[in-house]
Amino acid sequence: MVVPLQLQVPVTREGLRQAAEALRDWLAAAGLEGDAAYGAELGLEELGSNLLRHASPEGAATQLQIEARHSGALLELELIDNGAPFDPTTAALPNLHRPIQERPIGGLGLLLMRRMAAQLQYERLTDGNRLVCRFRAKARAAPPG
């Protein structure tokens, strides 16, 4: 079993860059690759960019807590922020049937995240948001010998 990744970063471009790098390193050390690893990276990137983009002085998130765990065939990414309520499991998705030039920008990351995750679970906390993303994971095969 791989030791879980636990870190807390400020909601800044640099903080999110450091979190993404730490997650990539942890995924590689855990031998995780493919859709689960990509989904976890996408989940962190999507939530982080939404926190940056939609941050307003009132209710803006300032901290993001990240925990990643791997057990058996499951990769779990837990993201907790101290911002205003935002439930990515119910947020409106883009209408893919409209011509691209008529679609508003945004929402495709959430769409991909919902499609890649085996389960997304949102909870509003007293002072923030908690999102748990679960992915079906396959570890890299160990080299023979």
How should these model regions be labeled?
Residues 21-45, 102-104:
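Conserved short strand/loop->alpha-helix "switch" segment adjacent to the catalytic nucleotide/phosphoryl-transfer site
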Residues 1-8, 114-145:
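Flexible, glycine-/charge-rich segments associated with ATP-binding catalytic modules
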Residues 102-117:
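Glycine-rich phosphate-binding loop
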Residues 50, 54:
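Conserved N-box asparagine in the HATPase_c
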Residues 55-60:
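A short, flexible helix-to-loop-to-beta junction within the catalytic ATP-binding CA
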Residues 63-73:
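Short beta-strand/loop element within the Bergerat-fold HATPase_c
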